[in-house]
Regions:
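Arg/Lys-rich, low-complexity, intrinsically disordered basic segments
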Residues: 3-109
Length: 109
């Protein structure tokens, strides 16, 4: 059995339609395996507005069509849910996301 250990590099995007990009890096070869851009740049999120009612509405609206489990880690929905909509504190949301992901995240501002 071959195990590939991943590290995720998280970037805040300075331009374009998305807020962030997560790149999955093979920790042994240091090569990018997959990347996911997420978070519509023109919209707010829980880490910005900190409104629990808006968070609940977001979660209810997206719950049925997105995979928020570890198997959905390569989807924008997974990243938006855990990084942008899990906690009003970005640093706490980052820790929550890392726990849900099961892999190390390196935030590269």
């Amino acid at each position: 059995i071959l195990f590939i250990y991943m590290v995720v590099h998280l970037y805040k995007l300075k331009s374009g339609p998305k807020k962030f990009k997560a790149e999955f890096i093979d920790d042994k070869t240091k090569k990018r395996v997959k990347s996911v851009s997420f978070g519509f740049a023109g919209m707010s999120n829980f880490t910005k507005h900190k409104d629990p009612e808006r968070q609940k509405r977001y979660v209810d609206r997206h719950r049925k069509r997105e995979d928020w489990t570890r198997s959905g880690k390569h989807t924008a929905g997974f990243w938006s849910r855990w990084l942008l909509w899990s906690d009003p504190s970005f640093s706490k949301a980052l820790k929550i996301t890392e726990g849900k992901l099961g892999e190390r995240i390196i935030y590269k501002h």
